[in-house]
C-alpha cells in the first residue's frame, strides 16, 4: 500500500511539474501569435550608446548585461547587420547598447559621459517613414529564445513574399514587448561608423579584385573571384541581423531556419513601396514612399531558407 502511495505521489509531483513548465512557457509567449506588418516604426529617432561587435552573435550577451548594468531603466537595443548563415560567424557584425533618448529629447551630458566612461560610443538613428515590424511578449528569459525562433521566420516569409528591401534588423526591448524593426528606407543611416568602415574595406577588396580581372582582359570572372564577391560582407550578399538582453545567450544558433542571403540583398527585383499595402499608419508614417530613397550602394536581399537548415530543426 505504501508503494502505491509513493508512486502516486511521484506521479502527482511529475504532473504538477509538467503543468508548471507549460504554464511558464505559455506566459513566456509560446502560444502568442506573431503578426508582421508594414507601417510606422515603433520608435522615433533615437540616440543610443552602443558597442560594436564583430564575431559570434551568441557572445553579445555580455554587451547587453554591461549596458543594462550602467542604467537599468533604459531600453536595450540591438542592430544586427549580417546574416550568420551567409557570413562567417567570426565576421558577423552588430551594435548593442541602450537608448539614451527618443524624439526631440536630448540625452543628458552626464548620461553620455557615464556610458563613454565604460567605452560606449554615442550615435543617432533616424525614424524611417515605413518599416516591416513585429512584436513578441518579453516576460521572461525564455521569451528571448522563443522570439528568435518564431519572429524571424515570420519576418523572412513576409519580406520574401513581397520581395521587399528591408534591412538591417533591429530589436528594441521596451517594457514587456520586444519590437522587431526592418527599415524600408534610409537603411544606411542605421550603419554605425565601425560598420561603414568595414563596408569600405570590403568594398575596396572587391574593387581590387575587379581591377585585377579587368587587367587580364578576361570577359568573365574566375570561379574564385565570383566566390570572393559573393561572400564579401558589403558586396552583393552581406549586411544585417538581430537579438536580445538578459542573462541567456543571444544570437541565432544553428537550429533556426535562417536563409543564406544577407540582409542587404533582396533579389534582383525588389518590389516598390507602391506595391506594398502599408498597415498601422501613424503620426510617424507617410502615405507612400519614393522607391528611389534606397541608399546609394546598397543591394537588395531575399530570404530563401535552405534544405540543410530546415533539417537542423
From Swiss-Prot:
Basic and acidic residues bias: start-end ranges: 251-263
Top-level taxon: Eukaryota
Entry keywords, A to Z: Autophagy, Chromosome, Cytoplasm, Cytoplasmic vesicle, DNA damage, DNA repair, Endoplasmic reticulum, Membrane, Nucleus, Phosphoprotein, Transmembrane, Transmembrane helix
Impact upon substituting residue 276 to A: Completely abolishes the interaction with LC3B
Membrane topology: Single-pass type III membrane protein
Cytoplasmic membrane side: 32-313
Lumenal side: 1-6
The keyword Secreted belongs to this UniProt entry's keyword annotation: no
Parts of the chain that traverse the membrane: 7-31
Biased composition (Low complexity): 264-273
GO biological process: protein-DNA covalent cross-linking repair; reticulophagy
Region of interest: Disordered: 193-313
InterPro entries referenced in this protein's UniProt entry, alphabetically: Reg_factor_effector_dom_sf (IPR011256)
Record keyword Transmembrane helix present: yes
Gene3D superfamilies assigned to the protein according to its UniProt record, in alphabetical order: Regulatory factor, effector binding domain (3.20.80.10)
Compartment annotation: Endoplasmic reticulum membrane; Cytoplasmic vesicle, Autophagosome; Cytoplasm, Cytosol; Nucleus
Residue positions, PTM Phosphoserine: 239, 244
Residue positions of motif LIR motif: 273-276
Molecular function in Gene Ontology: signaling receptor activity
Gene Ontology CC: autophagosome membrane; cytosol; endoplasmic reticulum; endoplasmic reticulum membrane; extracellular region; nucleus; platelet alpha granule lumen; replication fork
Biased composition, class Polar residues, residue ranges: 219-247
Subunit and partners: Interacts (via the LIR motif) with ATG8 family proteins MAP1LC3A, MAP1LC3B, GABARAP and GABARAPL1. Interacts with VCP/p97; bridging VCP/p97 to covalent DNA-protein cross-links (DPCs). Interacts with TOP1 (when sumoylated).
Cited function: Major reticulophagy (also called ER-phagy) receptor that acts independently of other candidate reticulophagy receptors to remodel subdomains of the endoplasmic reticulum into autophagosomes upon nutrient stress, which then fuse with lysosomes for endoplasmic reticulum turnover. The ATG8-containing isolation membrane (IM) cradles a tubular segment of TEX264-positive ER near a three-way junction, allowing the formation of a synapse of 2 juxtaposed membranes with trans interaction between the TEX264 and ATG8 proteins.
Domain notes: The LIR motif in the cytosol-facing C-terminal region is involved in the interaction with ATG8 proteins. The disordered region is required for autophagosome binding and reticulophagy, probably via bridging the long distance between endoplasmic reticulum and autophagosome membranes, because ribosomes exist on endoplasmic reticulum membranes that attach to autophagic membranes.
The protein's name: Testis-expressed protein 264
Species: Homo sapiens (Human)
The gene coding this protein: TEX264
